Amino acid sequence: MSSDSTPEGFVHEQRAVRVVFRAGSCAELPREVERLGLDRVAVVAGRRYADRVAGMLGARAVVVVADPRMHVPVEQAEAVRDRATAARVDGLVAVGGGSAVGLAKAVALTHRVPIVAVPTSFSGSEMTRVWGTTAGGVKRTGRDPVVAPRVVLYDPELLAGFPTALAVPSAFNALAHAVEARYAPDRTPVTDLVAEAAIGTMLTALPALAADDPAGRAGALRGAWMCGMSLDSTSMSLHHKLAHVIGGGFALPHAETHTVLLPHVLGYNAAAAPDAAAAVGAALPGGAEPSAAGRALQSFAAGLGAPTRLADLGLPRDALDRVVDTVLDAPYANPAPLDRAALRELVERAWSGAPVP
């Protein structure tokens, strides 16, 4: 049995969620809100969708937030919470990417009201009970079942026009959830199956997504659904810790940070998590041995035009030691030991874009 095979003993938790996946499903939003018995909802959506969604919901939309910000700044979360209190909201509708869903989660955390989510990116956040806010350059995360959307409407038509320069990193963001779920210490036979299916679905969809093919967008959306499912039932490890420290601490773009880091962390963990590395290697075009999966994933990402250097995202080189120190101050469980020197080499390579060893 390999070192990252599913433990013989495990605890598996699965929450109830209604998922509607079909073209045009966004039009079903009013019916789903009514089905939950919601009368006074706060709409959290990007500017592209806010007015449209508010119009669909009519008098039920008592608050409209059209400017969700990346990494959920706590000051914005508090402001929207105050508006929700004043309007006596009994539910939330989040339409957009991870920022919209994340802000809705921050409000649900304090107001204990249900969320209906309509994702327009591949973040996978809509399928998890994970929440996060950022204050003073520090990203704080946690888990609470109340923040997990009760209903998720996946509508591939909403992704038409999603620029490939943003879509591809968004898909890698979701992929990271499944990769870490596959080597999580609390994985189960179910999460292993979902994570491997998610990895295969997303890596298969990515070339078509990069070519702006509608089939690629639909495939990546299915992959994001499964990637989020796998993360919802497992713990996060080194990859997510690094992404939270770097993204939240230095205001780097969220999905792009995940994209750069994932091959390096996979390479770091490959020997200790060969099953996860094998799942990635098997799904890549042409295949790759587990020991080479990290480098193969890096080459694959570069070939799709994805970012490969933290330096290009705005991380200063003199911040690398601080990144490592912050990760080690409160580490997440990880299959490979967190050695400071090795971790420092990892972030240096990710910063410069050097090949994964």
Model-derived regions, located:
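ATP/NTP phosphate-donor binding region
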Residues: M1-D90, L310
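A short, small-residue-rich loop immediately preceding and capping a beta-strand
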Residues: A84-V107, H111-F122, L242
